[in-house]
Regions:
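Short alpha-helical donor nucleotide-sugar binding micro-motif in glycosyltransferases
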Residues: 80, 147-148, 271-274, 281-286
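A conserved mid-protein helix/loop that constitutes part of the nucleotide-sugar donor-binding site
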Residues: 19, 210-233, 243, 250-256
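N-terminal subdomain of nucleotide-sugar transferases
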Residues: 1-56, 376, 391, 396-406
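Carbohydrate-associated surface elements
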Residues: 41, 160, 180
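Nucleotide-activated donor-binding/catalytic signature segment of Leloir-type glycosyltransferases, i.e.
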Residues: 254-274
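Short hydrophobic beta-strand element within catalytic cores of glycosyltransferases
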Residues: 311-314
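Aromatic "clamp/platform" in nucleotide-sugar-dependent glycosyltransferases that forms part
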Residues: 294
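Conserved acidic donor-binding segment of nucleotide-sugar-dependent glycosyltransferases
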Residues: 325-337, 345-350
């Protein structure tokens, strides 16, 4: 098959969507498909990339680290028409997603759409008043429904997201396919003990320290502040515990100030963002992965952490249902007391449970190979259907015009 992937974010950017699309391209090519990626310009992108086409872009208002491609590119459209695409798979609701659907209409080929991001959790970046935020969330729900209903098939990473789209009145068939990870990349056996100890020493972590680790985007919706605010109480009688935060984002300075105000800078360590190619080593800084986020569609960092042999202690969320088995590969929590009990059970393990080994075992079904095979099955099913591009285009045009003129 000749497959076009349209995305607003791609390697070398570090985020769940970029990783997912990069991995999908890699694995589909391994199977034998021809895969073309259409994405945005981004700082640090390689000069030469096989079958990757980049369009001029601007920073995204909703998620400032992301970029949005400039709308319809005639030269790129001409090139796409020569590629003999069989199917277009969009990974964005914004300009490149719309561009992908326009091209699918012109080429009379089907569109599959993956819904990666729960945008209702990001509207606070645009609005600072409750009424405005309520309206923004309503707009997001309608816009999401339109984007999903104009595809022949929708893919989501978890049942949590499928249920959300059904509430939005998405009527297209929805397939739940967890995004996989390159399990080999996070294998702890790849890293020498000496290298891990050296990295821990670089950040002032002693060999016998017990380390909570958060790795990912540092932003309001990730709710890292809840963990930070609990640390003075938790560490009061547990002097050997440290909390390491790896990553960057708009909340970084605020959380650093919060940490300084609590006089915890020696216990809570911010490493800043780190290169994706070396991220497996940074997971080895931790003894347990911790998160209070409830904005995840799937939580790829949970999967990466478990693949790296780290048990997870995370705030209870439906996206964890298939990943976390409390008491076996980690714990969930709803309040501070449950957070502390979960951490203590892992740090001071007196029950003989091999949390880290169990975490690795659980992740076998989340391999990138399995992910690509499941997506390929969706492609094959969609290709066998009869569909009428004109009907889809009419629906899209009508709904988008209505959305922007009411």
């Amino acid at each position: 098959m000749n497959i076009g992937l349209f995305t607003e974010t791609y390697y070398p950017e570090i985020n769940g969507v970029a990783n997912s699309v990069y991995m999908l391209k890699t694995e589909l090519e391994e199977i034998g498909h021809n895969v073309y990626v259409f994405t945005t310009t981004t700082p640090g992108a390689p000069e030469f990339e096989h079958n990757v086409f980049r369009v001029p872009s601007l920073p995204c208002i909703l998620i400032t680290e992301r970029r949005v491609g400039l709308f319809y590119q005639p030269k790129l459209a001409s090139l796409i028409k020569k590629l003999n695409l069989d199917l277009i798979h969009t990974h964005t609701e914004f300009s490149l997603g719309i561009f992908g659907r326009i091209m699918a209409k012109e080429l009379k080929i089907p569109t599959v759409h993956t819904y990666h991001t729960i945008y209702e959790d990001y509207t606070h970046y645009l609005t600072h008043r409750k009424l405005l935020d309520k309206r923004a969330k309503a707009f997001v729900r309608v816009f999401t429904k339109i984007c999903c209903n104009t595809a022949e098939q929708v893919i989501v990473p978890t049942e949590k997201v499928r249920e959300l789209l059904l509430k939005y009145s998405v009527f297209r068939e929805i397939s739940v396919i967890p995004t996989g990870v390159n399990l080999k990349k996070f294998n702890p056996d790849l890293h020498l003990k000496e290298d891990v100890l050296k990295l821990r020493e670089e950040f002032g972590i002693k060999p016998d320290d017990k380390v909570l680790l958060y790795l990912g985007r540092i932003s309001k919706e990730k709710n890292i502040g809840e963990i930070i605010e609990a640390m003075p109480e938790y560490m009061r009688e547990r002097n050997q515990v440290k909390f390491v935060i790896v990553g960057g984002g708009p909340e970084m300075e605020h959380l650093k100030q919060l940490t300084a105000d609590m006089n915890m800078m020696d216990k809570i360590i911010f490493t800043g963002p780190k290169p994706w190619d070396n991220i497996g080593l940074y997971y080895q800084l931790g003894d347990v992965f911790v998160s209070a986020s409830q904005s995840e569609t799937q939580g790829l960092t949970y999967i990466e952490a478990m693949a790296a042999g780290l048990p997870v202690v995370a705030k209870k969320d439906k996206c964890l249902d298939d990943i976390l088995e409390p008491g076996w590969n980690g714990y969930d929590f709803t309040d501070r007391d449950e957070l502390f009990k979960g951490l203590d059970a892992i740090f001071f393990n007196n029950n003989g449970i091999s949390y880290g080994e169990n975490a690795k075992l659980r992740m076998r079904k989340y391999s990138s190979e399995e992910f690509a095979k499941n997506v390929e099955m969706v492609y094959e099913e969609v290709m066998q259907r009869d569909f009428i591009s004109e009907q889809r285009a009419a629906y899209e045009t009508k709904k988008i015009n209505h959305l922007f003129h009411t």
